[in-house]
Amino acid sequence: MEETQIDELYFSLMRIFCSQTLRAAGIDRTKVSLLNSFTDITIRYIRLLSETAMAKAEVGRRSCCDLGDLRLAMEEIGLLNGSEEDVKTLVEWFNGPQVAELRRVSGFVQDSETQVKPKDWLTSLIQKQIRVSGPERFYETVFSASNEEEDVKDS
């Protein structure tokens, strides 16, 4: 693949992430130009954070950055102000339910008891249909027999 094709692929993947982020924030419609601008800003921000963290690692004569380098980079670009309260808030967020759900969805759950064997959508659909079959599947719908009786009584 050419360099431009790879860049376009990564941009498209990041645009999906950005659109999902906007949707999670309650914005369900946007212009394509705005989404592309938001994606570009996000890419530049992540690039700045990673380059700054890598520079901190190189100062320490390491080839890979660690959590301390990332924290210093966050302070340098203004994401954290260096206070202990900011760090506590960040640690609470990492230990919170949002990140736990992200780990579960991505398959990085460390506790083997909470891992569920994945099922494909067709198997799940078939099992759901097997559990609810016959007249019960129309319970509390417009097709249920109880609704027909109520309609007759109202007439």
Curated annotation (Swiss-Prot):
InterPro entries recorded: BTP (IPR006565), Histone-fold (IPR009072)
GO CC terms in record: chromatin; cytosol; nucleus; transcription factor TFIID complex
Keyword Nucleus among UniProt keywords: yes
Transcription is among the record's keywords: yes
Pfam families (UniProt xref): Bromo_TP
Top-level taxon: Eukaryota
An MF annotation (GO) of this entry: protein heterodimerization activity
Keywords: Cytoplasm, Nucleus, Transcription, Transcription regulation
Subcellular location: Cytoplasm; Nucleus
GO terms for biological process, alphabetical: transcription initiation at RNA polymerase II promoter
Similarity annotation: Belongs to the TAF3 family.
Function: Functions as a component of the DNA-binding general transcription factor complex TFIID. Binding of TFIID to a promoter (with or without TATA element) is the initial step in pre-initiation complex (PIC) formation. TFIID plays a key role in the regulation of gene expression by RNA polymerase II through different activities such as transcription activator interaction, core promoter recognition and selectivity, TFIIA and TFIIB interaction, chromatin modification (histone acetylation by TAF1), facilitation of DNA opening and initiation of transcription.
Full protein name: Transcription initiation factor TFIID subunit 3
Gene designation per UniProt: taf3
